[in-house]
Amino acid sequence: MKQLEKITPRDVDFSQWYTDTVINAKLASYGPVKGTIIFRPYGYAIWELIQKYLDAKFKELEVQNVYFPLLIPQSLFQKEKDHIEGFSPEIATVTRVGDTPLPEPLFIRPTSEVLMANFFKNEVKSYRDLPLIFNQWTNVMRWEKTTRPFLRTSEFLWQEGHTVHSERKEASDLTLKILDTYTEFAQNALLLPVIPGKKTEKEKFAGADSTYTIESLMHDGQALQCGTSHYFADNFSKPYEIKFQNKEGKLEHAYSTSWGVSTRLIGAIIMTHSDDNGLVLPSMVSPVQVRLIQIKETDEVIKVTEDIKEALKNKYRVDIDKTDKSFGFKISEAEIKGIPLRIEIGPRDLENNQVTISRRDTREKIQVNVNEVTNIVDQMIKEYDANLYAKALKNREERTSRANSIEEYKNILAQNQGFVLVPFCGEIECEDDVKKQTSTNSRCIPFDQDNKTEKCFNCNKDTTLKVYFARAY
């Protein structure tokens, strides 16, 4: 089949390839305001599948869904100093209604910690009121300078969880349970071989005591943060006065967390799995898992097509391309949309009671007896997903290096983008210096540490920490 000319090859211009894939797969279009996108039905369907999977996992952790307002009074936001400093350059502000100035500026939420904290303050009186474990599926706005569909947009969709607890350990444990949930989801549903770990002091969330992350490596060797979980200790409960009466009858500040993933995950899927022919989607988040295409609409072809759909529909998202387009166009469209399996049904194959099944990832075709379609589809979907994960893991492993000095680190960066594991002191000033020299930053402190004392790769101080650094989106 001819290569789709609309898509720039990855190796020619990765950035343009990404944009071409988003547009041609009809995932999104550009909005009228810079940095905004229109989620087209196919792109939004992927987000709905992400929501469905994660929401079920959250409910297993007794998370309750809520919805909080879009607007935050400036005075409320400014109570947590680190938080306001972290977000102030990106905040969009409402100052008037019609021609009437507002008595106080209102911020369009960049995140909802302060709104949740204000609610918790009024809601929590006793340890018996705790824990409160909330989540909302919503939009937020952060006025980004450099934007790209899904990866970095001024308005994006996400889930943000916010919790408050009577015990420090309970809050800290939940932070890690959520990280485990994100890790399992990324690896099993999105087929992203992520590295879970802790953020450095420089990279942790504004106002957090500690931030945990899952980091993934894209096809071009740049890292992408795919989800974060933050433990605040009492950093928010003190300025927002979230107090409760403990079991001893004394007033105590509560312990809080927040955590989130966003539509940036769609960008991660594209940049990890897709190819020069368009989108390649993991089966769990593919709006259509199996597409049936008729070569010629004879009575027998129509009947067999409907029979196959009936046999598959209880287990898979399956459709029939009934558009009035040419057979070649239908094949190209199924490819560019990343549909995992395509079944072609035509009169010639049916003479031998066969149909043709094609895999999107390898583009291999096999002829299958009509009676075996269900079993073969089961097998091929498993093989398809396993291959996507294996390819992504191979890319990460081939692009992961170790360095012991800043010179060695720079040499690696010059030759090969990817993760570089280095001994690092963890100090903010040292990381600032690394960023100034290399335009890279730390991605995470992996949980798997050897605890050997070595010299920091940049400042030469003794350290036991090993940290991943990389260029990142």
UniProtKB/Swiss-Prot annotation:
| Domain of life according to the entry | Bacteria
Recorded domain comment: Consists of three domains: the N-terminal catalytic domain, the anticodon-binding domain and the C-terminal extension.
Entry-linked SUPFAM superfamilies: C-terminal domain of ProRS (SSF64586), Class II aaRS ABD-related (SSF52954), Class II aaRS and biotin synthetases (SSF55681)
Q: What is its EC number?
A: 6.1.1.15
Pfam families, per database record: HGTP_anticodon, ProRS-C_1, tRNA-synt_2b
Keyword ATP-binding: yes or no?
Answer: yes
Q: Give any Gene Ontology cellular component.
A: aminoacyl-tRNA synthetase multienzyme complex
Mind telling me which NCBIfam families this protein's record contains? Answer: proS_fam_I
Which gene is this protein's source?
proS
Q: What is this protein called?
A: Proline--tRNA ligase
Cellular localisation: Cytoplasm
Q: Which GO terms describe its molecular function?
A: ATP binding; proline-tRNA ligase activity
Q: How does it assemble?
A: Homodimer.
Which GO terms are recorded in the biological process aspect for this UniProt protein? prolyl-tRNA aminoacylation
Q: Which keywords appear in this protein's UniProt record, sorted alphabetically?
A: Aminoacyl-tRNA synthetase, ATP-binding, Cytoplasm, Ligase, Nucleotide-binding, Protein biosynthesis
**Source organism per UniProt:** Mesoplasma florum (strain ATCC 33453 / NBRC 100688 / NCTC 11704 / L1) (Acholeplasma florum)
Against Gene3D superfamilies, the record matches this protein to: Anticodon-binding domain, Bira Bifunctional Protein, Domain 2, C-terminal domain of ProRS
